[in-house]
């Protein structure tokens, strides 16, 4: 409250000369501070990226001969590991699929009406209808052949 009265009574608002000079210096100081902070952060990140690059080059220089010497062993081993991992993942996925199919069949056969049972019943009815139509058509042709 006292600050509000002082601003109104003392005239220390934005309209007088002293406040305007302070306002012009404020953005310059903030800009300078932001620039120094950005330069410091950018410079330190540049130094760190250079150190990481140098470390990577040194590590590759040391590791390349080792990889070349052991590549006849490492490459087939990596291929074998990849194939084994793919086999385990595939067998696990197929096992889960088989369990879900058996679960669905159990629910269907016990009458618990799992999702998709209506479609299966509809397809079964259509197949039975077509089979009946084919049987009747075949019986009709047999009767015609015997009559002539």
Curated annotation (Swiss-Prot):
Membrane protein topology class: Multi-pass membrane protein
Annotated InterPro entries: Oleosin
Disulfide cross-links: none
- Segment Disordered: which positions? 1-21
Source superkingdom? Eukaryota
**Residue span of region Hydrophobic:** 35-106
Q: Where is this region: Polar?
A: 2-34
Which terms in the GO cellular component ontology are assigned?
Answer: membrane; monolayer-surrounded lipid storage body
Sorted alphabetically, the keyword list is:
Acetylation, Lipid droplet, Membrane, Repeat, Transmembrane, Transmembrane helix
From the record, what ranges are coiled-coil? Answer: none
UniProt lists compositionally biased (Gly residues) regions at 8-17
Give the location in the cell: Lipid droplet; Membrane
Look up the record and give one Gene Ontology term from the biological process aspect: lipid storage
Residues that span the membrane, as ranges: 43-63, 66-86, 87-107
Coarse class of the primary localization is other
In Pfam terms, one family for this protein is Oleosin
Q: Per the record's keyword annotation, is Acetylation included, yes or no? A: yes
Residues bearing PTM N-acetylalanine: 2
Which family, according to UniProt? Belongs to the oleosin family.
Report the protein's function.
May have a structural role to stabilize the lipid body during desiccation of the seed by preventing coalescence of the oil. Probably interacts with both lipid and phospholipid moieties of lipid bodies. May also provide recognition signals for specific lipase anchorage in lipolysis during seedling growth.
Q: What is this protein called?
A: Oleosin 16 kDa
Species assigned in the record = Oryza sativa subsp. japonica (Rice)
